[in-house]
Structures are given as C-alpha cells and as structure tokens.
Amino acid sequence: MKLIRFGEINKEQPGVILSNGKKIDVSNYVTDYDENFFGNDGIQKLGDWLSKNQDSCPEIHDDIRLGSPLSRPSKIVCVGLNYAKHAAESGMDIPEEPVLFFKSTSSIVGPFDQIVIPKGSEKTDWEVELAVVIGKKASYVSEADALQHVAGYVLHNDVSERAFQLEKSGQWVKGKSCDTFAPLGPFIATPDEIKNPNDLNLWLKLNGEIMQDSSTSDFIFNIQEVVSYISQFMTLLPGDVISTGTPFGVGLGLNPPRYLKEGDVVELGIDGLGIARQSCKAYK
C-alpha cells in the first residue's frame, strides 16, 4: 500500500495510491496518518476497508498538492555518517556505533514544496535518504525483531546548513532543523511494497546534474541494526521517523564545495519510493 496526504498546507487529508496509479481520498475512514493510526493496526484495517470500499472513494486529481505522507511525528531521529564514502568526504572517521541526532519536526514539508534557504545561510546542502516510519512501539527490541516495528519507508531530503551544523559550537541539530529542511514523500510504501530496504538505489540531481547515485546496500548499519540500536536509548513511538543517512555526493564534499542557491532545483528518488522535486528560494 502507498499512503499519501493531500491538500493545502496544514489542512492535509489522507489518501492512498492504488496499484493502478489512481490516487483516492480515504478521509471518510481515516482521520490522519499519525501515532493513533499506525499504533492501532491502521494499515491492516485500512486495507480491509479498501477491499470493500475503494470504488466509492473520491479520486484525487494530479493538480492537488501532496503534503508529507504522515502527520507530524513525536520525533525524527537521524543517523549520521552511515555510508563510508560520505564519512570520508565529510572529513570524519567511520563510526563504530550509529551517530544519532534529532531533526525538528517543524522542518517537515511535502515532497514538492519549496526549500527555503535560511536567513544568514551560505552553505545549505542536499542529502537524499531512506527514512523508516515506525509502526509499533519499540523499546529494547532485538535486530531479529526490528522489522516487525516498521510501518513503511519514505523518501527524505535531509536538507542541511553546514555552517550552522559544523562551524558553530554545539550539536548538529541547528543545521538540520530549519523550516522546510525535511521534505518527505511523495508516499509511504508499506513493507510489502519494498522487497529489501537494505538494497535500494537512491539518487539526487541538482539542476539536472547527478550529484548522488548509490545504494542502501552500502549502509554501515542496516535498517535492523539502526532500529534496534535507537530503541536501546529511547522509545520509538508509532509514526516516528528514522532517517538512515546519506551517501557520497553532498555539496560539502565537492572541491570546491557547492551549495544550494535561490532558483536551484533538487530532484531525488529511491527505488519503489517515487521521486520528489524541490525548488529553492531565499528567506525573505
């Protein structure tokens, strides 16, 4: 199943993309894709309901905005330096354990919304990432059981301001949490849609030029390891997002470095998770 949310900003409603590509409105049955939905077996219940009711659901036309495919979660947990070549281009050692940081949930936007380059920014960068949506409360889970706690997978551009992140004292969160810095979507793919999340091609283009082109098979820590590891330190709630890191090819690692500017267009995609596109504008 592919879950979407559509409509005006802060007024999004739940929908589904059917196997034939048709988008339908399921707001007569589902209130939102949130902690309550995921934590109460919402995906299974929605599937059962659709088997009897999908033909009566209104169609969502292509000119309707797609928002983030899930409501604001309790947290976004990110894994840093989870590809060896990206660690090298960042001038950092390959980690022996997952590097974790938070990203503000207020940074979430839709897959085709604009990226706003923050006030005072000169080093806003791109990062294509596979994100995991938690479907069942996870605390002290084993690697063997980790995937049982996953509701689905979603495309994420972990937009990052490198000066805020790396050149000022303190934690990375400052460079990761600006408004519009977490475009998610276009949809959440449930696990049955994704054969192996640890072997997916992912790519990113800047103004049509390929900047990142890799595979999650290059993970240092795979999905099972990451979910289990994080759950040893905090409880993951249904609807929470784990972003699993970016591969080689960010602007920071180029010689000379290259960063986003007003008018730039970023396109990104992951096998089975669709394509997103964001244009950039400066804060005003």
Where are the regions a protein language model picked out?
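N-terminal accessory regions of nucleic-acid-interacting proteins
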Residues: 139-154
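Structural signature of FAD isoalloxazine-binding scaffolds in flavoprotein oxidoreductases
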Residues: 8, 94-111, 124-126, 261-272
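Short helix-loop capping/hinge motifs at secondary-structure junctions, enriched
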Residues: 138-142, 193-196
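Short, structured patches in soluble enzyme cores that scaffold and shape functional sites
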Residues: 5, 103-105, 112, 119, ...
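N-terminal non-catalytic cap/leader segment that marks the start of a structured domain
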Residues: 1-98, 267
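Catalytic-pocket segment enriched in acidic/His residues
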Residues: 5-10, 47, 51, 58-59, ...
